[in-house]
Amino acid sequence: HEWMDVGAWVYENFDDVVRVDVAELDMYDDGGAMTYRAGTKLVTHANTAKIYAVGPGGSLHWLPTAEVAEALYGATWYVMVQDVIPGYFSSSYVSGADLSDMYPNGTLLQVGEEMYYVMDGDVRPFADSDAFDANNFDYDNLIEVDDVDAYGAGESVTGEETGLAGFMPAESSD
């Protein structure tokens, strides 16, 4: 089953899953649909030809051309694209700035052995692989680039940071 492949990257197995009654589940608020984690996928939906990069909190950053997508995400950028159900798309994601030559917040970049987290126009270097791992990042989501000269130098990531390690819901515009 396809869902088993998705589950495999989260947990080694399902041994710690606890079954609960629907009545118990109903005691909790519905948190809505989960967005893709920033920097891991590009998204679209059936009612548009637009492709978006996902930033923190489900912010969407339109890639206006295939050339921009290729320049940022490589020649096989299209393998990162995931279809999102249109209803989830409009209710779970929020608009962000369009992309041209800079990566959105939440993108993981790699120059040689150095790894960086993009944040507000800066790149934050990871002090070591332990700092990377502590924030639940996946090495498969690193984008190899020649340099990060266009970015400012941010504070080093030295360990777990709540804003990096966990899901951060989008801010409501209400």
Language-model segment annotations:
Residues 1-174:
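Short, surface-exposed polybasic-aromatic patches that bind anionic ligands, especially phosphate groups
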